[in-house]
């Protein structure tokens, strides 16, 4: 916290003087805080309330991978893949101090395995895919590269010959036929990124407030009740 950043006490004092706010965001994870920052940059007045620490729930718990939705290609959700890959690329560009490329290696044990089940699943027919051969994986990664082309900052996928991948990673099963390499991303500190989003939002629109340990209690008519977890103080907004 620098001298120019509002303390929690200062933000609570500002909240006491607010009777009405157009937008109330409940939850201070990556989605809530990203919304707070976006609205602040657009000049929309808003308040964000998080009952615990920022980024203390689902945003902190996962593998910390930032993926572009590769698995959704099999179910034909191309729009979701395009959006996820674009957001991944934006994070790589805008938050490179926290988000880095991560190479993924896929050992492949057949050439044509899974072609028919993959086609049925793509057509939304019942299918169980037990194996994905080189052809299915090659096609999937080609599409993944295509949908992640906007603002690309990572290499495209590549297929790696058996002898080359075993030389590079000798502990792999030597019965593999070929391997594939593609890139997604991972984040080192999602908590720090969420805090940066909060500070960006409050700097862009100084009237906006992001507060942790502020619980959403209830809605009564057109009134919303918030409560400071630490002191028990209650705030009413319309």
Please place each PLM-identified region on the residue numbering:
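Extreme N-terminal leader/targeting segments of oxidoreductases
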Residues: 1-23, 38-42
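Glycine-rich Rossmann-fold phosphate-binding loop(s) that bind the pyrophosphate
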Residues: 27-29, 51
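Helical element adjacent to the flavin cofactor pocket in flavoenzyme catalytic cores
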Residues: 180-238
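N-terminal Rossmann-fold NAD(P) dinucleotide-binding loop
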Residues: 32-33
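Short hydrophobic core segments
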Residues: 24-26, 238
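Dinucleotide-binding Rossmann-like beta1-alpha1 core, especially the glycine-rich loop
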Residues: 64-166
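Glycine-rich FAD pyrophosphate-binding loop
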Residues: 40-60
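Gly/Ala-rich phosphate-binding loop of Rossmann-like dinucleotide-binding domains
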Residues: 36, 40-41, 200-202
């Amino acid at each position: 916290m620098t001298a120019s950043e509002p303390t929690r006490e200062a933000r609570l004092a500002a909240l006491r003087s607010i009777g009405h706010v157009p937008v109330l965001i409940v939850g201070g994870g990556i989605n809530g805080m990203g919304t707070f920052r976006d609205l602040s940059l657009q000049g929309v007045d808003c308040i964000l309330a998080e009952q615990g620490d920022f980024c203390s729930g689902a945003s902190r718990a996962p593998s910390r991978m930032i993926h572009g939705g590769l698995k959704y290609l099999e179910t034909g959700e191309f729009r979701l893949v395009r959006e996820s890959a674009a957001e991944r690329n934006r994070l790589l560009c805008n938050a490179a101090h926290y988000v880095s490329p991560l190479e993924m290696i896929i050992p492949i044990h057949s050439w044509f395995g899974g072609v028919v089940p993959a086609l049925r699943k793509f057509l939304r027919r019942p299918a169980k895919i037990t194996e994905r051969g080189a052809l299915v994986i090659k096609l999937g990664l080609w599409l993944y590269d295509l949908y992640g082309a906007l603002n690309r900052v990572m290499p495209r996928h590549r297929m790696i010959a058996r002898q080359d991948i075993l030389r590079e990673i000798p502990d792999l099963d030597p019965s593999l036929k070929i391997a594939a390499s593609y890139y997604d991303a991972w984040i080192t500190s999602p908590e720090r990124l969420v805090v940066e989003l909060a500070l960006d939002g409050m700097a862009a629109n100084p009237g906006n407030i992001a507060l942790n340990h502020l619980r959403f209690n209830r809605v009564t008519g057109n009134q919303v009740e918030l409560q400071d977890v630490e002191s028990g103080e209650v705030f009413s907004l319309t």
